[in-house]
Amino acid sequence: MTRKKDSKYNGYIMMLRRDQVGTRMTELVKQIMDNGSEADQQVLEQVLTGLAQKPAKQQTYINLLFGFETEFTSDGLAMTMPVTSLVHNTLGIVHGGVITTLADTAMGTLANKMVPEGQAAVTTEIQVHFFKEAAGSRLVCKCSVLHKGRQTMVFESKVYREDGIMCGHSTGSFFIVPKKN
């Protein structure tokens, strides 16, 4: 086959795959809407809403999936997230890994805001301590800088329930690296 024919053939195969995926997605959504619980349907809506916002926002899938909202403050950053069935563990409470992800994302967002142009910050270590159940309908993570050096940064974050009670505390170390294009 010539290169032009290869390209046309590959485009046709991709279109067929897209149609198959679209059909499968439609079947899965219908199955959840027909047989799923209300919580299943809410999780599906949250996932699809996050994905629908992806092209319009320069955010990660994690931010969109969990509904993270960021506000830079005079002393750092506050990141909030809704508490939904998507983030519950088998006990029906917020999974510790999700709280850790919230803290890491908040600290990483602040770290990447602070690095010089052409550089990025990556997590090298994170410690998390849980104090209370993360109850309520929203969590807020407040983070601040403990140390900013030429090659490393250290941050502290505190995760609060909507009633103001701290449910988690973490520190994170970040290494400054060249940004990949």
PLM regions: where:
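Terminal targeting signals and extreme-terminal segments of soluble enzymes
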Residues: 2-140, 146-181
